[in-house]
Amino acid sequence: MEKQIDTDRSFKKLTVRLKWRCWKRRILTAGVAAMVMIGIMSAFWWWEQEGITVPESAGQPGIKPGGNCAVLVLGNGCRVDLQKDCDTLQLPGISWDHRKGTIVYDGRENKTGWPERNTLMVPLRGEYRLVLGDGTKVWLNSASSLNYPVQFAEKERCVELDGEAYFEVTPDPERPFIVKSGDVQTRVLGTAFNFSAYRGENASTITLLTGKVAVSAPGHAERVLLPGQQLKYDAENRKTVIKEVDAEDFVVWKDGLFLFNDCGLEEIIPRLSRWYGVTFHYDREKFGDLKFYIKTRRYEDIGTILNLLKLTENVTYSIEGNEVTLYRTGENK
């Protein structure tokens, strides 16, 4: 069964496709398995060379989406709010455009007194783009931080990540680019990849788009990834799994999109929580059999994506302040 619904007149050719299959009850079984497929097609928002300008939200009033927000911590401990201080503070060799959420380091400058390492911190409901001194481009997702040298050393380029980032590494065969996150280390020469390793979550995930990377983790020999491969390391049981994926699905967040492909709520909720800065409440057991396909813009109010979940006729919700509660349809609130 397929339905087409005009969910927002402000966007032309906006299509919602709803498919579901109800599995028949079988003798001695107590549950019903369901697969829900929701697709949404809307305008794409692409990064310009210098960054992206976040559009006005066109969603219903409610909890607003995130946007360009970051704090730059200098080597001497000084903190620069890139939203408030960007028009008044000047630093040698560093420029930024907060409207486009971009900070750029000029690697040609090396002045005495420069801090050795900086940290770019992106809070909940934030995102930012960084161009390092070697020209490497980094997109930082919400609730993430990157520690890096103002100028890289002669033998290697090493950064430390907490959270999620997409890297487009400038090739330099003489200086491998190394990303460290906890016990996991990724070494590249020049490539594009996504690295997700949030503190408090057991899994670290590296997804390769182009080039080649070598990943090392405790208890495992170095593993080499090829384009279209994803490595997931479970820190709790120290297991590593490599599988083939559509790598583009894992980096569309940098282009202003949410894409959940055959995902359960346990995968969807953390991303929504970080981006909208809200707390979700739901009974995992009641939603364990549901999988979703959702594609929509990140810059809509939270009600837009919650209403997409509601279209499945399996999910309802309530919002109170910054807390969202999800219910299985028919469940008493």
Named regions from a protein language model:
Residues 33-37:
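N-terminal low-complexity or simple alpha-helical regulatory segments
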Residues 1-13:
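A short, acidic loop/turn at secondary-structure junctions
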Residues 14, 18-19, 23-32, 42-333:
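A residue-level detector for the "anchor" residue at the start of short, highly conserved motifs
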